[in-house]
Amino acid sequence: MKKLKLHGFNNLTKSLSFCIYDICYAKTTEERDGYIAYIDELYNANRLTEILSETCSIIGANILNIARQDYEPQGASVTILVSEEPVDPKLIDKTEHPGPLPETVVAHLDKSHICVHTYPESHPEGGLCTFRADIEVSTCGVISPLKALNYLIHQLESDIVTIDYRVRGFTRDINGMKHFIDHEINSIQNFMSDDMKALYDMVDVNVYQENIFHTKMLLKEFDLKHYMFHTKPEDLTDSERQEITAALWKEMREIYYGRNMPAV
């Protein structure tokens, strides 16, 4: 896309929001309570603040304010308001490609915010536990928050990811013509690294004329031991392993497709 010469400030709002899910099977009530306590502590407000603050540091944003809160019985939220340092729009890369990983990211946010909320929960009887982190990065100006996508997903490893990206508003060039998007994008997947894309099955649902993009990701490899909390698969009978595997896979597909499915 040809670089635009703007009249005044870039007034486009670019919002990236995504949910990440971690799935676990806890055999007993004690194990379920233990998983919820473990994941709640792992992603408490202080830890989330560190992740988001590091994100701001890596992308070159100034932190204006931090609001954080842990909740009872579980859950946490953090919101960070940021502003950008002076940046020459001519230096901004607007091509479609994966954002760099944490050690190499350099970018700027403008009049923006980054927020995260966590939602641990468990099935009352079935032994299934899920942890959801809801993250939003919203920017005004020349930078797309998609550049932070690689870093954040790598920081929060997950079984399922749903991502939404939208560009709202318009900005004018020096001739007064409106522009409703200022960078190339055909798919959110084009902003992910090859190693990440190799790990997940993905599907896109995009509304190009509305500048709305949606990608769903489901982890390809399924290893039961990674989903058990304090119980080893080898300590279970074959029928128990099959039953738990079926329950976990059903849970993951329901979350991925966003609908309840009949038992097989």
Curated annotation (Swiss-Prot):
Q: Which cofactor does it need?
A: pyruvate
Lineage, top-rank taxon, reads Bacteria
Pathway where it operates: Amine and polyamine biosynthesis; S-adenosylmethioninamine biosynthesis; S-adenosylmethioninamine from S-adenosyl-L-methionine: step 1/1
State the active site.
112 (schiff-base intermediate with substrate), 117 (proton acceptor), 140 (proton donor)
Q: What Pfam families does the annotation carry?
A: AdoMet_dc (PF02675)
SS bonds (residue pairs) = none
By sequence similarity, the record places it as follows:
Belongs to the prokaryotic AdoMetDC family. Type 2 subfamily.
Name of this chain's protein: S-adenosylmethionine decarboxylase proenzyme
Question: Gene name, please?
Answer: speD
